[in-house]
Amino acid sequence: MAGRESDAVSLAGVVLAGGESRRMGRDKATLVLPGGSTTMVEHVLGIVGQRCEPVFVMAAQGQPLPPLQVPVLRDELRGLGPLPATGRGLRAAAEAGARFAFVCAVDMPGLTVDLIDDLVRSAIETDAEVVLPWDGRSHYLAAIYRTDLAERVDALVAAGERKTSALADSSDTQRIVMSDSAPLANVNTAADLPAPVRPGH
């Protein structure tokens, strides 16, 4: 694992790729980005992998993915939202020995290692359980989570919660104001796709 503050902590990565992609009309993870032959999941893994080790991909049962050089964990149940997948990813990261995990959605082609570094820096300085970016709204799926929150996720899911906001609301959460929203942008329709994407920097 290379990179500044992320070298000082045990940081895993969790990429949530199993969303239903209703607005896009097709699976976002395997969407080929403009200007090349790289899929969205491969592009995001290329960025996350620069700062995180190991990296886990959370995918739906039966969801086709390109060959990946990281563990793929399949959802046990469909349609339960991102919280259960986040919890499973945090547990896998904890079992791998990581204290923190960067959890992100797969549909973030503008993601940068600088964003991850900023969040990690705050995690080190504050020792918060959750560190997430804020640009007028909270971005729960581009955030640092302590891996020991996996059991709290289990309790929230058992209580009927499905959104990652429930985890942040029940945790010691630090929000970092971001002046640049581009790394946080999600791709929901074909019109949201950027011009040929450069690797995050």
UniProtKB/Swiss-Prot annotation:
Biological process according to GO: Mo-molybdopterin cofactor biosynthetic process
Keyword tRNA-binding recorded: no
Cofactor: Mg(2+)
Membrane spanning stretches: none
Binding site for Mg(2+): 107
EC code(s) of this entry: 2.7.7.77
Family under the similarity heading: Belongs to the MobA family.
Protein role: Transfers a GMP moiety from GTP to Mo-molybdopterin (Mo-MPT) cofactor (Moco or molybdenum cofactor) to form Mo-molybdopterin guanine dinucleotide (Mo-MGD) cofactor.
Protein name per its UniProtKB record: Probable molybdenum cofactor guanylyltransferase
Protein species of origin: Mycobacterium ulcerans (strain Agy99)
